[in-house]
């Protein structure tokens, strides 16, 4: 990606993600509010990855994605009928993918990121405590 935008729901999360430096821009909005998401993002993006743990975020993700772009739904809270019907209702020409959660070696890669990338480790331990990344 040429630019990474993180969308978070609270000022606390905004401060954490901004401090981490992992995103080029951090915006705050309720992911369940499609109009607020679109306004916060501004210019639609090429790829949207949905990894929230609350239902009702499908339409915001679709609105945030540029025509011809891709939405990756990587959340067990996703309603795929809502996503499909929402894309049709919004006249959105986007590709929608389902993240299945498993890729060979994914656990090792995730742990390696926490161990070797200071920004990822700091963001992780700011939520879980310093001993959790050991």
Q: What residue ranges belong to the model's regions?
A:
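Glycine-rich phosphate-binding loop and adjacent beta-alpha segment
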Residues: 52, 56-116
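C-terminal capping/lid region of NAD(P)-dependent oxidoreductase domains
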Residues: 112-134
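Flexible, charged surface loops at secondary-structure boundaries
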Residues: 40-44, 63-66, 134
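A polyampholytic, Gly/Pro-enriched intrinsically disordered region
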Residues: 25-28, 95-96, 118-124
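Adenosine-nucleotide cofactor-binding segment
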Residues: 1-56
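Short, solvent-exposed polar/charged micro-motifs at secondary-structure junctions
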Residues: 36-37, 108-110, 133-134
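Short leucine-rich amphipathic alpha-helices used at interfaces
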Residues: 40-41, 69-70, 120, 126
């Amino acid at each position: 990606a040429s630019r990474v935008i993180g969308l978070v729901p609270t000022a606390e999360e905004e401060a954490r993600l901004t401090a981490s430096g992992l995103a080029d821009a951090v915006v705050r909005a309720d992911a369940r509010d499609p109009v607020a998401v679109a306004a916060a993002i501004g210019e639609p993006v090429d790829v949207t990855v949905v990894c929230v743990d609350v239902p009702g975020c499908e339409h915001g993700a679709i609105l945030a994605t540029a025509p011809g772009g891709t939405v990756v739904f990587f959340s067990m809270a996703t309603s795929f009928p809502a996503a499909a019907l929402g894309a049709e209702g919004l006249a959105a020409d986007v590709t929608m993918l389902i993240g299945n959660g498993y890729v060979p070696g994914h656990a090792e890669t995730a742990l390696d990121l926490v161990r070797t990338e200071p920004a990822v480790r700091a963001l992780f331990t700011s939520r879980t405590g310093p001993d959790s990344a050991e």
